[in-house]
A protein has these predicted regions:
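Helix-to-loop junction immediately C-terminal to a conserved catalytic motif
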Residues: 49
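Catalytic Walker B motif of ABC-type/P-loop ATPase nucleotide-binding domains
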Residues: 156-160
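Conserved ABC ATPase "signature" region
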Residues: 98, 102, 110-127
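Conserved ABC transporter NBD signature motif
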Residues: 57-68, 72-74
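C-terminal coupling/interaction segments
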Residues: 259-306
Length: 306
């Protein structure tokens, strides 16, 4: 176990931001912390990084209280925070990388193959010798991620890591994060609002609403908590246009949904479509539907599936 968060409370100006927050983070997992804007996600990350102190409760890293570890803790963790300037605007991209390499006291230098590969993967080669004060938001995010990814830290905190990135860069980043977890056995803790990122990466999910944990458990169980009407979808080869079927057509395939597999099958037989059927599958609730469910349960019992 990497982290144990026990009964954490945090207040600002007599307002409670986090209340009785408790959960555990396991090694080599990707944990996604979900919540609306202002739910307390970034405050929680800052507490786990030791940047601010809790008013009540304890945070343990490998069984030791953060308050007792001291500066050596930061040899084990690295972070990119959305609300914090992670780089120096008056330095070039290259100079920022060299500066943070020096702080980390690693044996590698700027010309290391892995660092050069990251620069190319995130399309920063043409701007790497320019002052980062002129970078776009997406470029700054990419540079911050390169600096974070090049450390030997066991734990990586990523606060809204794909914010400001285009689709292709987001996809590349997700692949890199997954690789870090599976191949380099890093523990990754991230916050995100983007459903596709959550679907691609989450092993474990923590949902915070109004400063309290309303769900904690693995990703598949997270989706299964929603009481919903069963829905089935048939995928049919070709573009089928018929008013009764109410098809959704995409990339040469037609998609038909019904609440019963018997109803769906009967409809396909009626319209002589069984020979064109690719598959029928039961649909799971989306991330958005699941979050809406938990938000609607405010004031109820915390859900926990370990």
């Amino acid at each position: 176990m990497v982290f144990e968060v026990k009964g954490i409370e945090k207040r600002y100006n007599n307002k409670t931001i986090l209340h009785n927050i408790s959960f555990e983070i396991l090694e080599n997992n990707i944990t996604v912390i979900l919540g609306k804007n202002g739910a307390g996600k970034t405050t929680l990350i800052k507490l786990m990084l030791g940047m601010i102190s809790a008013d009540k409760g304890d945070i343990l890293f490998k069984g030791e209280n953060l308050s007792d570890i001291g500066h050596s803790y930061y040899q084990n963790v690295s972070a990119v925070l959305e609300s914090v300037d992670n780089v120096y605007p008056f330095l070039t991209g290259k100079q920022n990388i060299e500066y943070f390499l020096g702080l980390s006291k690693q044996s590698i230098n700027y010309m290391n193959d892995s660092i050069q590969a990251l620069i190319d993967e995130f399309d920063l080669r043409d701007a790497i010798d320019e002052p980062v004060g002129g970078y776009s938001r997406g470029m700054l995010q990419k540079l911050s991620l390169i600096i974070s990814l090049m450390t030997n830290a066991e734990v990586l905190f990523l606060d809204e890591p794909t914010l400001g990135l285009d689709f292709q860069s987001s996809k590349q980043l997700c692949q890199k994060i997954k690789q870090l977890s599976t191949e380099q056995e890093k523990t990754i803790i991230l916050t995100s609002h983007q459903a596709e990122i959550i679907e691609l990466l989450a092993d474990y999910v923590i949902v915070i609403d109004d400063g309290a944990v309303v769900y904690k458990g693995d990703y598949q169980n997270f989706l299964q908590q929603v009481p919903h009407t069963e829905e089935f979808e048939a995928v049919i080869e070709g573009e089928v246009i018929h008013q009764e079927l109410k098809c959704c057509i995409e990339k040469g395939k037609s998609y038909v949904k019904r609440n019963s597999i018997d109803e769906l099958t009967a409809l396909l037989v009626k319209h002589n479509l069984m020979s064109h059927l690719i598959k029928i599958e039961k649909l799971s609730p989306t991330v958005e539907e699941t979050l809406d469910y938990f938000y609607s349960q405010r004031g109820g019992v915390q859900h926990e599936v370990i």
